[in-house]
Amino acid sequence: MSFEGGHGGSRCRGAESGDAEPPPQPPPPPPPTPPPGEPAPVPAAPRYLPPLPASPETPERAAGPSEPLGEVAPRCRGADELPPPPLPLQPAGQEVAAAGDSGEGPRRLPEAAAAKGGPGESEAGAGGERERRGAGDQPETRSVCSSRSSSSGGGDQRAGHQHQHHQPICKICFQGAEQGELLNPCRCDGSVRYTHQLCLLKWISERGSWTCELCCYRYHVIAIKMKQPCQWQSISITLVEKVQMIAVILGSLFLIASVTWLLWSAFSPYAVWQRKDILFQICYGMYGFMDLVCIGLIVHEGAAVYRVFKRWRAVNLHWDVLNYDKATDIEESSRGESSTSRTLWLPLTALRNRNLVHPTQLTSPRFQCGYVLLHLFNRMRPHEDLSEDNSSGEVVMRVTSV
């Protein structure tokens, strides 16, 4: 047995006993092949090891079998082995160039690989660059994509809003034509131009005015027919209106009874003894005075009752709203018609002059008699009361929704 010593370690060889050389180490396994479509992995750089010093030739070594080429004898690390010297620092460009010249392809930048090699080398270089970047760039990529998607989503929303603004909508319920036919009943233009007929009728009944609150144009509303008695709806009235109605009703009943009794006492042959009695003559004077008071009460409170009747009539009539006609509007303006008077007496004058009411509706004696009496009582009111009503410019038709 002979021992050969060297600077980097010791090597054992059994020349005398005929021991064979130790078996060579198996070659390292090949790197795993990446699936198609993914970049090739970057192999790790080989660790730096200093070269072993050449050992002197000995007779045993010369007599022994020759070692095959390409095999490296195993090294035994000892205490005398020195650590590898540190690598010298090189600029980034030189390091990349040196790596490219030495055959270490994975350290090549994508630009250099694309300029130097084919598409395979550029893909490998791009894959190595992505691996060297690591997972730190993924949030940035996602944020860019998310910002692009959010910006595209915001653009779609703005486009949707602009498309909605171009569609005509009702200025009362803010719905489109799918809820009903849209009308143009007044001079308003733009986004407040159109409205549904049912929405406008409900707004007129609740607001109590035939005019538009924006352009002050009187709607062309016509009465079609009265509802059936089973479809009549009640309206809400205030306490003052209730007192006024009760006073007018009681005054009317007392006036009718008093006038009837006075006429019977004056012309009946069976009341001769009453006309001669002094007590009945005093009663005649008192009844005459009370009749005058009742007439004044009815005239004073008749307008309030008339307004309540108009409200009830507006609720229990079928109305139709006409579209705005510019030619008619110009013609009415040229004639100098007062919108206040037309608005105040619209249900009476407009319907009679244009013959828009059905012959069987509101023209029968049972409706016409009371309607004309209330109208006459309202005309007999003092002028200051009429001026107060005309100053408002609206039909008092305040009706709550039922």
Curated annotation (Swiss-Prot):
Transmembrane segments: 245-265, 278-298
PROSITE patterns hit by this protein: ZF_RING_CH (PS51292)
Intervals of motif PDZ-binding: 399-402
Molecular function GO labels: ubiquitin-protein transferase activity; zinc ion binding
Compartment list: Cytoplasmic vesicle membrane
Region spans: Disordered: 1-161
Biological process according to GO: protein ubiquitination
EC number: 2.3.2.27
Pathway annotation: Protein modification; protein ubiquitination
InterPro entries: MARCHF11_RING_CH-C4HC3, MARCHF4/9/11, Znf_RING-CH, Znf_RING/FYVE/PHD
Annotated domain remarks: The RING-CH-type zinc finger domain is required for E3 ligase activity.
Subunit structure: Interacts (YXXL motif) with AP1M1. Interacts (via PDZ-binding motif) with LIN7A. Interacts with unidentified fucose glycoproteins.
Protein name: E3 ubiquitin-protein ligase MARCHF11
Species for this entry: Homo sapiens (Human)
Gene name linked to the record: MARCHF11
